[in-house]
Amino acid sequence: MNFEKYAAKGNLFIKELAQELGEPDNRAKAGRVLKAVLKALRNRLSHEESMHLLAQLPMCIKALYVDGWKLTQSPEKIRSVEEFIEEVRKHDVPRGELDFADKEQALKAVKAVFRVIKRHISDGEAQDVEAELPRQLKELWEDA
């Protein structure tokens, strides 16, 4: 195992996200935002689709995705963007209200995470993720 390689790919992912967020020097925030959005997305997708997505993420990012995951739990019935944003805030304790202060900032952050994820997965996998999302979240995923 080449842990340096895994760390480098994870750092690149976080650096890309920090750039997308417009705060290239704030990698701590990028990490928090990534973790919160990944957990909210994970809790919305089926376990099977989560496994497919997980297989394409960099190793260090996989760790964020699976942290605290309970496979016995069924996917959340999140239907709207507002519900998704609330789920994201819930996973960014205690900074959720700061990192996702209002709907506009939250949408910007979620789209930034979605853009970076989509750059690191195949087009087919991006379509598979999109297919599992409700209409409003599909639009958010497509716009990213």
Placement of each model-derived feature along the sequence:
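Extended intrinsically disordered, low-complexity coil regions enriched in Ser, Thr, Gly, Ala
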Residues: 5, 43-77, 121-144
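Short, solvent-exposed interaction modules
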Residues: 65, 69-121
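Short, flexible domain-boundary/linker segments around small modular repeats
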Residues: 6-26, 30-39, 80-99
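Short, low-complexity cationic-aromatic patches
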Residues: 24-36, 42-51, 100-112, 116-131
